[in-house]
Design a protein with these regions (language model features):
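Rossmann-fold cofactor-recognition segment
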Residues: 47-65
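C-terminal helical subdomain
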Residues: 185-187, 191, 211-273, 277
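Active-site Tyr-X3-Lys motif and surrounding loop/helix of classical short-chain dehydrogenase/reductase
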Residues: 69-76, 95, 102-109
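Canonical Rossmann dinucleotide-binding motif of NAD(H)/NADP(H)-dependent dehydrogenases/reductases
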Residues: 1-29, 33
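Catalytic loop of short-chain dehydrogenase/reductase
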Residues: 90-97, 105-108, 127-186, 193-208, ...
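Rossmann-fold scaffold of SDR-type NAD(P)-dependent oxidoreductases
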Residues: 7, 79-89, 135-138, 190
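A short, exposed helix-loop element centered on a Lys and neighboring polar residues
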Residues: 119-120, 176
Length: 280
């Protein structure tokens, strides 16, 4: 039986994938921070006769310690992991800079560090599966944002947009570094941009932007059911190359600073130091 681990598996795209794989007979481990959402997913699993294959793990992935604890829990309860899907995200485009209890800027911690810890931490469990794949869901192919090498925690000149875009670019580099570091690993790392998808995401935005985003979503957004279909195809038939990027079904060239190998390895080493010390 396949094991599919999905962060953000209790809502939006992650939930869509969780329900799909439960229906397909896989064991699904869904991670989220809200117990009520986990309970609702388990109820849906029971409704499709998959209660014995559905697991909800509550974790606040803004915390490196929580992400590491999650790795340990998954390693000790799952003999192998076939698919790791990284969807946990909460945009903070406005408002003041906030810092986690471990001292990291919020977007850096949730949208990037947790994905770094889970990708590297679960590598061995993934390598025990026949066709392992990591799908890192974000915005590859969007030419915005950069790594602020001299101040990645954005202690100076912070803006929520800057932090969010930095976390996206960091995830592009995470895939490149992963492939460079483990060239002989069978794990396929897919950076994935789903396009505009109608999820709960706008409800977490501040009021004026929420209204605008919802209006734009009503015109432009794909449903979760439709958006999940090309994701499933890639997850079930991962590309042969170790690192790839897609926007929906379209393969993206790994060109430009977002996919630069030197920058990727530089960020890897910087992150390794941060995670080891668990402080910026
Ligand atoms: N929707 C789009 O149009 C779109 C476009 C481009 C890229 N994406 C990317 O697709 C991915 C999924 O987005 P979505 O729209 O499906 O999001 P969503 O509907 O808002 O779901 C986000 C998920 O992340 C979890 N989460 C948030 N904060 C967390 C925390 N601190 N710890 C653990 N889990 C946490 C949420 O669970 P809790 O609420 O329980 O914490 C929820 O399950 C994201 O990476 C996003 O950047 C989405």
């Amino acid at each position: 039986m396949q094991t599919v681990v999905i962060t953000g598996g209790t809502d939006g795209l992650g939930r869509g994938l969780a329900v799909h794989y439960l229906r397909q007979g896989a064991r699904v481990v869904a991670v989220g921070s809200t117990p009520a959402k986990g309970k609702a997913l388990l109820a849906e699993a029971a409704a499709v006769s998959a209660a014995d294959r559905a697991v909800f793990l509550r974790a606040d992935l803004t915390s490196v310690a929580a992400a590491e604890e999650l790795v340990t829990t998954i390693e000790t309860t799952c003999p192998s992991v076939d698919k790791l899907v990284l969807c946990a995200q909460r945009y903070r485009l406005f408002g003041p800079r906030t810092v986690t209890s471990e001292g990291f800027e919020h977007s850096f911690a949730l949208a990037y560090l947790s994905r770094y810890v889970l990708s590297h931490g679960l590598r061995k469990a993934l390598e025990s599966a026949p066709r392992p794949v990591i799908m890192n869901v974000g915005t590859p192919g969007v030419p915005l944002g950069r790594i602020h090498w001299d101040d990645p925690q954005l202690t100076h000149g912070y803006s929520g947009t800057k932090a969010t875009l930095q976390s996206f670019r960091a995830n592009d580099l995470l895939g490149v570094a992963f492939a460079a570091l483990y060239a002989d690993s069978p794990v396929s790392h897919v950076g994935y941009n789903p396009g505009v998808v109608s999820t709960d995401m706008p409800n977490h935005l501040p009021a004026p932007l929420r209204v605008l985003t919802k209006a734009a979503f009503a015109l432009l957004a794909t449903s979760v059911t439709k958006a999940v279909a090309p994701m499933v195809r890639l997850l079930d038939e991962p590309p042969g190359e170790r690192c790839t990027a897609y926007r929906s079904s379209r393969r993206l060239p790994l060109k430009g600073p977002a996919f630069d190998q030197d920058a990727a390895l530089r960020l890897h080493h910087l992150t390794q130091d941060l995670v080891t010390g668990a402080k910026p």
